[in-house]
Amino acid sequence: MSTFYEDNMNIKKINGFTLQQVSRDVWAIDEFGIDIMYLIIGTERALLIDTGIGIGNIRSVVETMTHLPYDVVNTHHHYDHVGGNGCFSMVYAHKKAIPVIQEQNNLQSRKEFFRSQEARPEYNYEASLEFDASIIGDFEMKGIEEGFVFHLGNRDLEVLDTPGHTKDGICLLDRK
């Protein structure tokens, strides 16, 4: 179980990422002002929700925050949610998302994504210059659908199909 920081912001920095504790054992991970991911730490396992655009090494953040085994899940196929997948050996996603995620796992797609973001006021251009192409790599994908459950020990997160933003969108429901 992670420590709940009692300062007024519950914020810490790890390898350039800013983490804010949003509730006990739930952390929002800001990727250089570009994207937010979530880490939920259970008593037996942890779950990283999305991997960001992949500028920094999100794996090092997860492994600094917990020594528990963990799973990684993408909520949909958009690049700002799957760009760090190459940091991990296996990632879960809705079965409809897998072909798109695999197709965009290349340097050209990454560069096109960065260029498409440059006009956004929150885009951190300096961070994109730090991009490490070595994180574009092979990783196994496991398809999931509604009803799949991530068991973390003291909490279960159930997959709900939530198409809309994309046809392969999912949400995770913690019934506790």
Give the location of each predicted region.
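Short, basic/low-complexity N-terminal boundary segments at the transition from targeting/disordered tails
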Residues: 1-19, 122-129
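Short, solvent-exposed secondary-structure boundary motifs
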Residues: 6-12, 26-31, 131-135, 139
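Mature, folded catalytic cores of secreted/periplasmic enzymes
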Residues: 7-8, 15-18, 68, 137-139, ...
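Conserved beta-strand hairpin/beta-sheet module of binuclear metal-dependent hydrolase folds
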Residues: 13-64, 171-176
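Short, hydrophobic/aromatic-rich segments at coil-to-beta transitions
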Residues: 22-28, 147, 156-158
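Residues at the C-termini of beta-strands that transition into short coil/loop
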Residues: 23, 30-32, 76, 95, ...
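Metallo-beta-lactamase
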Residues: 45-48, 53-54, 133-135, 141-142, ...
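Active-site HxH/HxHxD metal-binding segment of metal-dependent hydrolases
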Residues: 55-152
